[in-house]
Amino acid sequence: MNNGVSQESSVLLDLASHVNRFAFDSFRSDNNKTLLSNFLHFNGNTRTGAAAAKRGVSLGGKVGGASVRFGNILNDFNRAVRFHCEKIPIGFASLRVGDGGDGADGNGNGEGNGVRVDECGGVENEGFRGNGVEGEKPKKVLILMSDTGGGHRASAEAIKAAFYQEFGDDYQVFVTDLWADHTPWPFNQLPRSYSFLVKHGPLWKMTYYGTAPRVVHQSNFAATGTFIAREVAKGLMKYQPDIIISVHPLMQHVPLRILRSKGLLKKIVFTTVITDLSTCHPTWFHKLVTRCYCPTTDVAQRALKAGLQQSQIKIFGLPVRPSFVKPVQPKDELRRELGMDEDLPAVLLMGGGEGMGPIEATARALGDSLYDENIGAPVGQILVICGRNKKLANKLSSINWKVPVQVKGFVTKMEECMGACDCIITKAGPGTIAEAQIRGLPIILNDYIAGQEAGNVPYVVENGCGKFSKSPKDIAKIVAEWFGPKAYELQQMSQNALRLARPDAVFKIVHDLHELVRQRSYLPEYSCTA
């Protein structure tokens, strides 16, 4: 593990090389820290005017092995934060983004009320004026996401498609990666950092669980906001949104703080659409949202414990692409279109958008288990989705299989692939689970990401719509039994999956949003032209 981290050519190593170019003469970096984990800890009071705020960030936890190198990198970044804040005091202080103090009531009626960002990023005090006219132009929806895993973008695109399908040109919907598109380096490297951390499980677990305590992630956002508030404000305001939808746990805190300081919380509908089915990072929940759309009752209970009111919470399900709601073609027709055998039962083997996981080993095991040596014929077939992994697709296509096997790359009509099959093997991604339930597919989970996907395993297993195993041989045995002596179990799990399915979730979400924005009598007027 240590060698893997030391040899990884990643954004984090690039981060170290950049921050070491700074000249420091007063801040000491130690290997032994006493705080909880690798979080940014904000310390110091916000001051405006000539007295600039001094802030620092700390890396906590006593770590060893591969994590020591990771810790040293963030220690160097810690020094960069202190240096940058002392020399270039920008961000919340210069934007006058307060926390509701100094007479503020949380809606901009206090210090910081009425500020705006001009095209050059400067601050003006003319405020955001309601135009006094009912909305005649298309209303604008801004969806905040990040490409940290495929599920956030998939949910964003599903919501966008549902708005267009239900309301046509009445809404203009924009999808933006807030961190990648509207924050400076190194914060715009978030997707790359996530990919690195997920590949190294212990580092990801340290990050996920270490930032879970409220005191930790609030300090993190406070320090981070020092650098990104100006850019984020410009990014938000240039879209002039009537509705802002966050489909990512890191897209609530800084935008909401900016909107509150500008007095826009009652003018712009800000909502969160949670894309995790069970285990949720606490950063998903913020008390200032207009709505928090939860996919399950378990997530709704977590929202209540986080301090949200019942009136803020709606349990509609996980938004999936509207195409999954359309009538399903018969299996034999779909199989014929996909080049599959029309009569044999089929298993769908997926590895996500990047074709990750033990796909080849599982496919080979299935090839053996689905061939009956006694009759010399296959008892099932395999549809493999390799995503963008062309090397894997080519390798699987070159194998001389004993059973019918169809190998696909990146597909856009997943509803057809699922509709052609009788069960699915996949990692515990929430979007794939929700889509499989809509199609009534029993699910075999073969892996999960620690933290946000860990709860999806008991969600599937305990609700009787699937099983979990990391062993390719055990998985192949389960499928062979489902296609043979345990066909009754396959049928029961299919019914359980359909019972949990919420195919209309995305439509309920957009209609509720439409009603919320309709209740707003005035539309805000913006001045940022950046």
Curated annotation (Swiss-Prot):
Coiled-coil parts of chain: none
A GO MF label: 1,2-diacylglycerol 3-beta-galactosyltransferase activity
Catalytic activity: a 1,2-diacyl-sn-glycerol + UDP-alpha-D-galactose = a 1,2-diacyl-3-O-(beta-D-galactosyl)-sn-glycerol + UDP + H(+)
Top-rank EC class of the record's enzyme: transferase
InterPro entries found in the cross-reference section: Diacylglyc_glucosyltr_N (IPR009695), Glyco_trans_28_C (IPR007235), Glycosyltransf_28_UgtP (IPR050519)
Cellular component aspect of the GO annotation: chloroplast membrane
Entry's EC annotation: 2.4.1.46
GO BP field: glycolipid biosynthetic process
Keyword Plastid: yes
Span of chain positions assigned to the transit peptide in the UniProt entry: 1-105
Entry's transmembrane regions: none
This protein's UniProt keywords: Chloroplast, Glycosyltransferase, Membrane, Plastid, Transferase, Transit peptide
Predominant subcellular localization, coarse grouping: plastid
Keyword flag Cytoplasm: no
Record localization: Plastid, Chloroplast membrane
Family: Belongs to the glycosyltransferase 28 family.
Function: Involved in the synthesis of the major structural component of photosynthetic membranes.
Protein name as annotated: Probable monogalactosyldiacylglycerol synthase, chloroplastic
Organism lineage string: Eukaryota, Viridiplantae, Streptophyta, Embryophyta, Tracheophyta
